[in-house]
């Protein structure tokens, strides 16, 4: 599953790109529900700061 690092700038690009929508705004960065993540990499491909990383 992917997770979002502290590099996240909360731009929302990953949330709109994800085909299964496990991404949501968190307290300071977006968060990914690891159980719902299908590991497609769409979030990582669109992120301008490479915040989504694969576990």
Curated annotation (Swiss-Prot):
GO MF annotations, alphabetized: 4 iron, 4 sulfur cluster binding; metal ion binding
GO cellular component: cytoplasm
Cofactor: [4Fe-4S] cluster
Alphabetically ordered keywords of this record: 4Fe-4S, Electron transport, Iron, Iron-sulfur, Metal-binding, Repeat, Transport
Free-text comment on the cofactor: Binds 2 [4Fe-4S] clusters.
Record flagged with keyword Iron-sulfur: yes
The keyword Membrane belongs to this UniProt entry's keyword annotation: no
InterPro entries with a match to the protein in the record: 4Fe4S_Fe-S-bd, 4Fe4S_Fe_S_CS, PSI_iron-sulfur_center
Source species, domain of life: Bacteria
4Fe-4S ferredoxin-type domain span: 2-27, 28-55
Annotated [4Fe-4S] cluster 2 binding sites: 18, 37, 40, 43
Binding-site list for [4Fe-4S] cluster 1: 8, 11, 14, 47
Function noted in UniProt: Ferredoxins are iron-sulfur proteins that transfer electrons in a wide variety of metabolic reactions.
Protein name: Ferredoxin
Lineage: Bacteria, Bacillati, Bacillota, Clostridia, Eubacteriales
